[in-house]
Amino acid sequence: MTSTLLAEQSDSPVTPQRVLEEVFGYQTFRDGQQEVIESAVEGKDSLVIMPTGGGKSLCYQIPALVRSGITLVISPLISLMKDQVDQLKANGVAAECVNSTMSREELLSVYNRMHSGQLKLVYVSPERVLMRDFIERLENLPLAMIAVDEAHCISQWGHDFRPEYAALGQLKQHFSHVPFMALTATADDATRRDILERLRLHEPHVHLGSFDRPNIRYNLVEKHKPISQIIRYLDTQKGNCGIIYCGSRKKVEMVTEKLCNNHIRAAGYHAGMHADERAYVQEAFQRDDIQIVVATVAFGMGINKPNVRFVVHFDIPRNIESYYQETGRAGRDGLPAEAMMLYDPADISWLRRMLDEKDDGPQKQVESHKLNAMSAFAEAQTCRRQVLLNYFGEYREKPCGNCDICLDPPKHFDATEEARKALSCVYRVNQSFGMTYVVEVLRGMQNIRVREHGHDKISTYGIGRDHSHDYWVSIFRQLIHKGLLFQNITRNSTLQLTEEARPLLRGDVSLELAVPRLDTTARAAKSDKLTSKNYDKKLFAKLRKLRKSIADEDGLPPYVVFSDATLIDMAEILPTSYGEMLAVSGVGQRKLEKYADPFLDLIQEHITHHG
């Protein structure tokens, strides 16, 4: 076990910093990691909201190696478990998973190792962890901690609610003495509160990290000839790994066929394919044998591939959480990446029709609210990153400079009068109605609902009739993005004033908004180089080739050996000794022993021939 090895190497105690450096090969913690880890080491419950690629896994993996006993990790997908276990083993950590694909003999072997104290982390599905026989096994084990990954699946307000996750509160009740850590990258305020309540966390340490992924460029383009648009885009991404998401299996097959017909090597992936076919595509993508996967949302949650350089949405997702999660599969190594969406308002209309066919109920209301927010993001006239972060309750003061809106900004105007009309109307209808209704009142629409509520008699009725419905919708969405209005998901998406709205209503301040662009125009973002670091590009290419060869021999994805970010560090630092190699980010003691020699030889040879 890694903790044993660490103890053997010196008399000093096993600390989070030692584990970070010697096992995982990093010198410093990322934002928020240290506080979360220290809280877990002390035995406290935690809720961790951290962006994809922000280092969530280390938040429970490091405490697992510091605390005595076994850490149980509850994860929704077998592929995700396997990927995490492969990476831990590559770092010398004793880890295994328990899943439905394993034979009885394999399961018994893992159980024996659990009971003999040979394992530090065990990954398991929520379905299995709640089985009576498994709980009985756990009762006889020294549990260090229980981590619940993808914790948004617990909440009815989340975008991916799963009943088996919601039942995990029973586990906390059963093991009340064991510290729990719930982790997710996608949870708005309502979802966060629901996770805390359903999981029954006791006085938890709550870490709400920034949702910002600054290395990802967000770009929306008007969809007109989607296949041609994608082919032109892929032409700018030669040699890079990427995922193209489609809204249906039929589209996956169509797009894959068109790309292959245009001599672009791509593979399709959807739930209708045979399990062996899906496994082959996923494995080939992980190992860099396939560069592009065209997929439904069935693909991705189990992907921890750090060097995905782009994610394309052929169709708009149903909610911002899905968009954030799917685009978050790009650039997990921290290097520049791009998220491009082909947007057609008709796609939103189609999703609304699909939603209308569902039975009325709380879940339908939640889905409707989330679809409205996704539509607002797509039609945003302000910095897309600001809109995205605002949805998760995070406010960014300055535009990002790294989205299509910032790179090709819309025109702005003094919208003080329009904003005051809009906010006043929300106030006059007692902050009890949704956006469509308030716009109807503003525009003086004659309908039964407005008359029944007596809102055809209020002072703001009809004061906005000089502008179209779409114009006012754009104004309201911008006011939400600016934090002057709040759309309450738990009260039928009603509009409510925030404290920030008061100075504007009193006439103390003015406000600029974007002139509503009522027809979407294509805005292409300029492409970035991989990184601004000053590294040797030829050496980097050689290092990647060597990594692929070693990974294929070991039957591993290349990034499990070393990530692209680590190879770039090597190509910049040019290490020629073990000591210098340990200074490279991502090189720990186990990887140094296992992989350093061929990389050091290659670097020395390159220096000799190229100076």
List where the protein language model places each region.
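Accessory DNA-binding and partner-docking regions appended to nucleic-acid-acting proteins
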Residues: 1-19, 366-368, 397-611
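Short, charged low-complexity linear segments at domain edges
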Residues: 363-392
